[in-house]
Amino acid sequence: IALETGNADVEVKLVNSALVSIHIDGYKVSNPIGFQGRDVAVQIYTAFAPMVHIGALEKVADELALDLVAVAAEPFAVSRSVLGSDTDSNFTAILADIGGGTTDIAVVNDGGVEGTKMFGIGGRSFTRTIASDLDLSFKDAEKLKLNIDHDKLKPTVKKKVDAAIDKTLEVWLSGVELALGDFDNVDYLPNRILLC
């Protein structure tokens, strides 16, 4: 944990654990019962969260008189929502969820979540660049970003907004490339990318 977080003192809790795949002698099987083989490989997806975050969620649920049934890593939850409950799914894709402050990436191969990565560039980064480059308030820059394809937008303004977006997009693409480069345990990356 210290290697990933840079903090040896952080307490964490397992929040997700899911079977990704089972291979017997190199062949993928959905249920190993009844199979024989020399080489069994089981891949499991796990996600951990700092106890301070879990505690905050428990406190909010308690104050709202709600039961906290489960906590899930967001990219895992997004991928499960796409997959549904089909345990035999052969769905394969890279899911990129671009949020306000972060981008979460999940790699799904043959219905199994191979892993997830997150980096700190999201929609607000694009908005801040537009605001800075066009000397606008954050609120006005957000409106421009959301209405970039609107017919009433002047071509000169659209060109400036596009240029601002392109600057942040270059950095964002580098983040995607670095995140996907961390999947060195995956035989191949899916050729389909879905943006959420």
Residue locations for each model-derived region?
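Nucleotide/phosphate-binding catalytic cleft detector across ATP-hydrolyzing
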Residues: 1-94, 112-114, 123, 147-155, ...
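A short acidic Gly-Thr/Ser loop motif
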Residues: 88, 95-102, 108-111, 120-124, ...
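Small-residue helix-packing motif on alpha-helices
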Residues: 137, 141-144
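Residue-level detector of high-confidence beta-strand sites
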Residues: 116-118
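Helix N-cap / loop-to-helix initiation motif
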Residues: 67, 135-137
